[in-house]
Amino acid sequence: MATTTAGRVRTVTGTAVLAALVLVIAFGNPAYTDWAKNHTANDAWGFFLKQLAWPTWSFSSDESVRTILANDIKAVLLIVLTGVFVSLMVDSAASRSGRLFFSSWGAYLFAGALAGLLAAFIQANASLRAAFDWAAGGAIYGLFVGWVLAVVVFASRR
């Protein structure tokens, strides 16, 4: 599904990938993740702000190299898998409908869960239980943050 505006073609998948990239860069960076960890309250809004930092990425840290690599790959996989799942789940006839909103939200939820599951096996002391925890964290991230992506995708359609 593509919309042509002034010589440009916007697709749902492209919009979703761009929104996911912005979310990961803006809220997964070390400055935001440290701020969210240290300065948010233990309430619903603080929970949401901490969830925004789930796809954390870093180039240097006190953690092991494998954990840093796993976190970075998790962030990249989230963006790539968002494109894959949106292209698979969004119907071409779902322009400006509830189906577009909920299918793009669900695609982000699945992308987060699968990115967490796959990246968990790279970290130091990887285990199946830890992979399930990372997948659950990705699903929670997709549930609470995916609506932001869904709103952007929905608003991009005319």
Show which residues each predicted segment covers:
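Structural signal for membrane-spanning alpha-helices in multi-pass inner-membrane proteins
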Residues: 23-24, 86, 119
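Hydrophobic alpha-helical transmembrane segments
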Residues: 67-93, 116
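Alpha-helical transmembrane segments of integral membrane proteins
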Residues: 74-78, 106, 140
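Structural signal for the C-terminal ends of transmembrane alpha-helices
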Residues: 88-94, 152-157
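Alpha-helical transmembrane segments of multi-pass integral membrane proteins
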Residues: 107-158
